[in-house]
Amino acid sequence: MGSLPDQSSCEEFTDSQQDKMTKLLAMQLGPEYISRRSGPGGGSVTYLEAWKAIELANEIFGFNGWSSSIQDIHVDYVEETKEKKFNVGISVIVRVTLKDGSFHEDVGYGSIENCRVKALAYEKCKKEGTTDALKRALRNFGSSMGNCLYDKRYIQKILKMAPAQAEFNYDNLLRANKRPYARFAQKVSTPIESHANKSVKLEHKNSIEKKISNVDKPISDLIENDIHESLPALQNPPIQSHSETDLYADEELDSILMHHERPPIPESPRVEEFEELLNQFEGDEKVSVDKIDAHDKMTEAQVVKIPPVQFMNARVAAAENPHIKHEGMAFQLHKKSNSILKSSNIDHNRSMPIRRPSLTSNNSANTFSTK
């Protein structure tokens, strides 16, 4: 273990922190930290994944108690094959430093063969070498940082243990709506406003469809219904609740209470549209409701009721349907068909062995007859 020359910026661990780190570093890893992969010669290799090593370092040293730095990156070889592919090998030295100034450093290696792109080969080798060097530097601090994986007796015992399967905890997820930012707080209120606007638009659309379907009604009734339906939708949004007196100002409310009359309603801008629509329908014949009902009854009478599909036995179907002819329905086992060619010197009514010469003679006769 080394120490930095400049000790002025270092912060010492407390005695309790050092005792805790010493105990944790002396422990061996459980089966949930160990991973396996296929190694050379058909065997398996146990190793510690990089993300697990970083989590262990944060847990033991603290998230601000350690740091890592790349000391050197050396390209060992770069070869280009005849097929325009690249073989690259890079070695990396990484140093892991604690906040008290103590550090360990080690070398890692990354290689690739037959890579089509040179940049991808460099990227893969540098990342692989840096990760390997980081894990090798961390294992120098103690057994729980991955050094226990080099103990063969420990590996034999730990591989027999089944790792505990931890359930996924949704409470540990960092969600966007839980972060204390103003922009996220504003986004929460937008769905309510959009819902209110959608509800007003939906009511307005339904009122228009209702008026178009009731074209035969007088224009005065349509205008009156339109105003009565549009006023509550515009002045009484679904989020807030108002009484009938809240819809008018104080002066308008006084005039209503004094004269007991409805306030003057402004002329709807859609009156001219309804008048033009009525003028177009004046010359056309209106279909009455009685004619429509009579036409529906006639069509229902003309529709033939189809019985539901059922599965039944052939005998039951023949017994229930009197139109089926029962004559000649029995299967004739020995009936001969003229359309099927059969050998003349073979009895097809019984099962018996056939000699090979008879088959050859029959085949030759059939070929001559077909020609």
Curated annotation (Swiss-Prot):
This is DNA repair and recombination protein rti1. Residues 346-371 are annotated as: Disordered. GO terms for biological process: DNA recombinase assembly; double-strand break repair via homologous recombination; double-strand break repair via single-strand annealing; mitotic recombination. Active in the repair of DNA damage and in mating-type switching. Probably involved in the repair of DNA double-strands breaks. Has a role in promoting S phase completion. The gene is rti1. The keyword rRNA-binding does not apply. Gene3D superfamilies: DNA repair protein Rad52/59/22. Residues 358-371 have a biased composition (Polar residues). Interacts with rph51 and rph54. It comes from the Eukaryota. Keywords: DNA damage, DNA recombination, DNA repair. GO terms for molecular function: DNA strand exchange activity; single-stranded DNA binding. The keyword DNA damage applies.
